[in-house]
Amino acid sequence: MSSSPTSSSSGSPSSHGHRSETEKQRRDDTNDLLNEFKKIVQKSESEKLSKEEVLFRIVKLLSGIQLHHESFSTSPGPIRSIKKIKSDREQVRRNKRVAAYRELRKFIALNNLSSSEEIDKMENLKVLEIIFEVIRGKSITCTVPCLPFPILPFLPVFPVYSPLVFNSYNQFSLYPPHMPTVQIPIVPSSSFEIDALEIEENEKDIDIVG
């Protein structure tokens, strides 16, 4: 008996449903991690931060690199439609995420936390998971010469280094209450160069984390 056109179609409802559930789980896991990162980098519990702002602060915390929001802004230009304005804003948010994940991938490569082949194919969620483990202190191994380095609150860190700052409560913090001394791997910034590869994850955009 010949199969019906419906049964021979390339995509069944069950496969689409499974893919949708997988994507939803990935979004939920990503948002959960971003909420954890937000607790680390926010200046107060009431501070509102977008996902992109959280990522930018994590990049600065790990590598000392300040990604500037202004560099991603679109020019006002002539009067545009509401649809065009929303499209431009979404593109700006996407560009910010690409830039932030690129720097996080560089950090992973510079600190030998994964192979270059794995990093090239790595999904953004996996990038966040690795960074979260680093912050929790489970993946910090000094395989290269280290130097004690004082970190002053509110002062930028030279981007050649990858500082891992813990305060007196053993919490990772942008603004430690005391000036700690940390072990900083001496890693040349030119050791690796990771291309900016945007991995489309059909991620539903949520402006405010938490």
Swiss-Prot record:
Cell compartment(s), UniProt: Nucleus
Ranges for domain bHLH: 14-65
Identification of the protein by name: Helix-loop-helix protein 26
Source organism (scientific name): Caenorhabditis elegans
Gene disruption phenotype: RNAi-mediated knockdown in the intestine decreases the E.faecium-mediated protection against S.enterica infection. RNAi-mediated knockdown reduces the expression of genes including bar-1 following E.faecium infection. RNAi-mediated knockdown in the germline or the nervous system does not affect E.faecium-mediated protection against S.enterica infection.
InterPro entries: bHLH_dom (IPR011598), HLH_DNA-bd_sf (IPR036638)
Role description: As a homodimer binds DNA via the E-box sequence 5'-CACGTG-3'. Represses lag-2 transcription during embryogenesis via Notch signaling, in an unc-37-dependent manner. Also represses tbx-37 independent of Notch signaling. In the intestine, plays a role in probiotic-mediated protection against infections by pathogens such as S.enterica. This is most likely by positively regulating the expression of genes such as bar-1 upon exposure to probiotic bacteria such as the E.faecium.
Tissue expression summary: Expressed in intestinal cells (at protein level).
Protein's GO biological process: Notch signaling pathway; regulation of neurogenesis
Sequence ranges of Low complexity compositional bias: 1-15
Subunit relationships: Homodimer; binds to DNA as a homodimer.
GO annotation, cellular component aspect: nucleus
One of the record's GO molecular function terms: protein dimerization activity
Region listing for Disordered, in residue ranges: 1-33
Gene: hlh-26
SUPFAM superfamilies recorded: HLH, helix-loop-helix DNA-binding domain
Coiled-coil regions, chain positions: none
